[in-house]
Structure formats: structure tokens, C-alpha cells
Curated annotation (Swiss-Prot):
Protein name: Chaperonin GroEL
Gene from which this protein is expressed: groEL
Miscellaneous remark of the record: This protein shows ATPase activity.
Induction of synthesis: By iron limitation, glucose deprivation, and growth under low oxygen supply.
Outcome when changing residue 298 to G: In strain: PID 2
Residues holding ATP: 30-33, 51, 87-91, 415, 495
SUPFAM superfamilies: GroEL apical domain-like, GroEL equatorial domain-like, GroEL-intermediate domain like
A GO BP entry: protein refolding
InterPro entries linked to this entry: Chaperonin_Cpn60_CS, Cpn60/GroEL, Cpn60/GroEL/TCP-1, GroEL-like_apical_dom_sf, GROEL-like_equatorial_sf, TCP-1-like_intermed_sf
GO molecular function, one term: ATP-dependent protein folding chaperone
UniProt source species: Neisseria gonorrhoeae
Length: 544
């Protein structure tokens, strides 16, 4: 086991604070509408330019082990805030730096670190309650666009495209961000349920221009095994043919004689059919087949529940207004499923999201909810170069998370104003313990730091602006983008309450732990012996 370097007291705390400051100073320059970019070197490819706090934080590793521990703890603030709210990482880092700086002074002056932490925790709890009280619901497209553009560093185009996407797929719908092919941002909306399986044979195509198979008012047959024998299918095919309507078959696979017969019938015009594979694998496939069944009003024909393909009737088939099958995707538009059953299914999947542990599972479950509830929107980010696209994509993803958070818990005045107004909750907060009261005062001063940093990044004088904002009431604040004072919500400078709350809670949590640290242990790196020279090889010269 390698030897350890153990350090105590103020000396080690100072090293930890140095690490906090290095990371926080790199992150804080990105805050606000006039925040600067940070350029990050990459091992492969060009440098990465970003204004996203958590991206900057994740890149920082320091040489000194003790400084690095401080930096890593603040990195945790940024990534935790990002996980919970999706934005507000820079605000959280600035708050953590401020609480640590003020708190270390108090600890050095001889105050009890544990009582300071308790005071900080009580102050934060009071601020969070006050933020909930002053939050306003975020319902309109205009407000959603404003939140999006503020989060994307005052890029109004980004806010507008996110608001449009939310309007089209609903607040529950899935919105994904992809690389675009042009210079402009584009929005692509898939209405209805889409899954990533296409036709099993190109002979099913009936729209040569779009290269898709389009079925109007079709029946939908769902089967959870392979179909290779056409005899199993004949009874149901005859019933569909009598009804003179097309048929979509979704099964584990359709192959051999069965597929050949369907193709021949399709080409001759006897019966318009299309066969596709069922989406997903294993248990996820069963669940998705059940989703499609509920959406279209079908029954999944499965031997597990005693149903067989030969005995299937039209009552077991689902229906939809239109289904489009491409080479790689199938889209079901306006399924005939029962609305109450669809809602119950969505509620059931939401319950699974609550209990899911892995991010992958959660993401897949959320996709299923969106497909049942609304649809899927894809924002394609356009840019002139790859470096610009990465930077823009970071901002669009941040803005998307911020708008979701705003819809969830409402909005508060942006630009650091909400935290200043929430301070009113601390004015009458007395703990009956001098050191805990000092902890409350630390938070009271720290909540000014985001506004101070926004003003500093915009080239203003922080103290002058903070005093002027404190003289005002309600949503009165300073718009660093335009240099004006006024009603922040009226000017469209909004922050999601969830983002502000998460930033404050995570910053205080880690900062409190740092203040109560009195010993740090790091591994002493082993000195590697020098590589010996190639002695005795001198005579090689004569071999030429």
C-alpha cells in the first residue's frame, strides 16, 4: 500500500479553497448574457468552445492532490445541479465559492464549523420556501421561449424553436437535439407513435417519390413470435380482404413463404399488406408491443395468454387513421385506442420511471411516455463549423432542460434577482446561537454573488448595481444584456425556480461539508526509477 500524505487544520483548508477558486474562476466567466467563452483542448480533433459551466468544470484536474480535492467537490456541485435541473451549474458554482470563502474566514476566526453548517442549512431551507412562494407558473409559449433564450445566453432563436417544439408535442413530448445539415436551426416533428423498424421488403413500397409504404385506415396485427408459415395467417388475411382494407403486420419476424406470399399479393393488388419487425428486444419488445396495442386498440396475439394466429379475428386487430412505413421507421398516426386506457398506460410507465435506477432505462421509459402521449420533436442545430455546432448544441441542450424545469416548478425573476428578494425570509431568522447566526449571515451575503458576477462579466460595477437592485421591490432588477433597470419578468429575463433552488441547495450542501473538514489524506506519488541506459552496446558501430 502506497504511503499517504496527511494534513490538518487551516493549512489544508487553504489548499482546498485554492482548488475551489481555480475551478470556480474558470466557470464563473461564463455567467450571464455577456459571459465569455472557455476554450478546452481535446486529445483528438479541434478545441471545444463552450459557455456551459458543467462542461468547463468536468475538464478541470489539478496537479496538487489537496487543491484537486477542493476542485472535485465543487465539480460535484455543478454536475449534481446539472443532473437535477439541467442548468444553473455556473450559478451553483459561484454560490459555492462565495459560501466557502465567507465560511473559511469565520472558521479561521475561531467559530464552530458544525454550528456554521447548521446555520447555513437553516438559511437555505428558509430561502427555498421563499422561492416556492414567489415562483409563478410558466404556461405560455412566450414565457417558455423567454426561459429558453435566457438559458442559451440570450439567443432568441433557440428560445423560439424550443417553444415551438413544446407547442407541437406537448410538455410531456420528447424533444431531442441533433446535429443539423444546414446553417439554420430546424425543427422536425413526428406526430403519432414512431418506432425504429422499417418494411421487411422494398416491394411493399407504394409511394415511389417518398420511398415509403403508406396505409390509409389499416388494420394492425400484433404477434410476438416469428411468422414463416402462410397457413397460420390465411384465416385473418381472408377476413381483412373481405373488409377491403390494408393490413400492417408487426411480429418478431416474417420470413420465408409467409413474406413471399404477402409480397406477391401486394404486387398483384389482391391485398395491400406491409410486414415489419417488432421494435426492441426481450422484455422491452413485449412492453412496446403492448404500447402499440393500447394505442391502436389491438390485442397482442401471444401463445403465453392462450391466443393463436389461426384463431385471430378482426376484433383482435388494431386500427389507425394512417400508418407510414419507411426503410428504417414506422409511424402510427391517430390510433383508434381508448383514451382512458392510453392514459392509464402512461400513468403506469410514469410509475416505472420513478422506480427506475439506470439513466438508460429512464430515458427509454420517457420515450415510451412521449410516444403514447404526444409525439417526438427533433431540433437540428445548424452551424458553419463543427466547433461552433458543439458550442451551440451545448446551449440548446441547456435551454431545453431549463424550459422543462420552468414548466415543472414555475419561474422567478432572472439575473440573480430572485435570490436577493428571497433574502427577506432571512431577516427575522434567529437561531439563538451566535455561530449559527453567523452561518445565516454567510448565506445572506452569498446570495448576492450571482448578480455581482453577472454585472462583472458585463463590465459594470457590482456594488453599485446590487445596492440599486436592493432599493427596488418585487421583480425590479438589472438586465445585463441591455444595461437597463426594470421589471425582470416584464423584460423577459426569467429563471426556472427549480434551477435556482437546486443551485442553492447543492452549493450549500458541498460548501457546508468543506467548512467542517479538518483533515485531508492524499496518496504520495511513487517516484519511478530512471530507465537504465543501453550500456555495453557501443561496439555496434563497427557493424556498418
Amino acid at each position: 500500500m502506497a504511503a499517504k500524505d496527511v494534513q490538518f487544520g487551516n493549512e489544508v483548508r487553504q489548499k482546498m479553497v485554492n482548488g475551489v477558486n481555480i475551478l470556480a474562476n474558470a466557470v464563473r466567466v461564463t455567467l450571464g448574457p455577456k459571459g465569455r467563452n472557455v476554450v478546452v483542448d481535446r486529445a483528438f480533433g479541434g478545441p471545444h468552445i463552450t459557455k456551459d459551466g458543467v462542461t468547463v468544470a468536468k475538464e478541470i484536474e489539478l496537479k496538487d492532490k489537496f487543491e484537486n480535492m477542493g476542485a472535485q467537490m465543487v465539480k460535484e456541485v455543478a454536475s449534481k445541479t446539472n443532473d437535477v435541473a439541467g442548468d444553473g451549474t455556473t450559478t451553483a458554482t459561484v454560490l459555492a465559492q462565495s459560501i466557502v470563502a465567507e465560511g473559511i474566514k469565520a472558521v479561521t476566526a475561531g467559530m464552530n464549523p458544525t454550528d456554521l453548517k447548521r446555520g447555513i442549512d437553516k438559511a437555505v431551507a428558509a430561502l427555498v420556501e421563499e422561492l416556492k412562494n414567489i415562483a409563478k407558473p410558466c404556461d405560455t409559449s412566450k414565457e417558455i421561449a423567454q426561459v429558453g433564450s435566457i438559458s442559451a445566453n440570450s439567443d432568441e432563436q433557440v428560445g423560439a424553436i424550443i417553444a415551438e417544439a413544446m407547442e407541437k408535442v406537448g410538455k410531456e413530448g420528447v424533444i431531442t437535439v441533433e446535429d443539423g445539415k444546414s446553417l439554420e436551426n430546424e425543427l422536425d416533428v413526428v406526430e403519432g407513435m414512431q418506432f425504429d423498424r422499417g418494411y421487411l421488403s422494398p416491394y411493399f413500397i407504394n409511394d415511389a417519390e417518398k420511398q415509403i409504404a403508406g396505409l390509409d385506415n389499416p388494420f394492425v396485427l400484433l404477434f410476438d413470435k416469428k411468422i414463416s408459415n402462410i397457413r397460420d395467417l390465411l384465416p385473418v388475411l381472408e377476413q381483412v380482404a373481405k373488409a377491403s382494407r390494408p393490413l400492417l403486420i408487426i411480429a418478431e419476424d416474417v420470413e420465408g413463404e409467409a413474406l413471399a406470399t404477402l409480397v406477391v399479393n401486394n404486387i398483384r393488388g389482391v391485398l395491400k399488406t406491409v410486414a415489419v419487425k417488432a421494435p426492441g428486444f426481450g422484455d422491452r419488445r413485449k412492453a412496446m408491443l403492448q404500447d402499440i396495442a393500447i394505442l391502436t386498440g389491438a390485442v397482442v396475439i401471444s401463445e403465453e395468454v392462450g391466443l393463436s394466429l389461426e384463431k385471430a379475428t378482426l376484433d383482435d386487430l388494431g386500427q389507425a387513421k394512417r400508418i407510414e412505413i419507411g426503410k428504417e421507421n414506422t409511424t402510427v398516426i391517430d390510433g383508434f385506442g381508448d383514451a382512458a386506457q392510453i392514459e392509464a398506460r402512461v400513468a403506469e410507465i410514469r410509475q416505472q420511471i420513478e422506480t427506475a435506477t439506470s439513466d438508460y432505462d429512464k430515458e427509454k421509459l420517457q420515450e415510451r411516455v412521449a410516444k403514447l402521449a404526444g409525439g417526438v420533436a427533433v431540433i437540428k442545430v445548424g452551424a458553419a463549423t463543427e466547433v461552433e455546432m458543439k458550442e451551440k448544441k451545448d446551449r440548446v441542450e441547456d435551454a431545453l432542460h431549463a424550459t422543462r424545469a420552468a414548466v415543472e416548478e414555475g419561474v422567478v425573476a432572472g439575473g440573480g434577482v430572485a435570490l436577493l428578494r428571497a433574502r427577506a425570509a432571512l431577516e427575522n431568522l434567529h437561531t439563538g446561537n451566535a455561530d449559527q447566526d453567523a452561518g445565516v449571515q454567510i448565506v445572506l451575503r452569498a446570495v448576492e454573488s450571482p448578480l455581482r458576477q453577472i454585472v462583472a462579466n458585463a463590465g459594470g460595477e457590482p456594488s453599485v448595481v446590487v445596492n440599486k437592485v436592493l432599493e427596488g421591490k418585487g421583480n425590479y432588477g438589472y438586465n445585463a444584456g441591455s444595461g437597463e433597470y426594470g421589471d425582470m419578468i416584464g423584460m423577459g429575463v426569467l429563471d426556472p425556480a427549480k434551477v435556482t433552488r437546486s443551485a442553492l441547495q447543492h452549493a450549500a450542501s458541498i460548501a457546508g461539508l468543506m467548512l467542517t473538514t479538518d483533515c485531508m489524506i492524499a496518496e504520495i506519488p511513487e517516484e519511478k526509477p530512471a530507465v537504465p541506459d543501453m550500456g555495453g552496446m557501443g561496439g555496434m558501430g563497427g557493424m556498418m
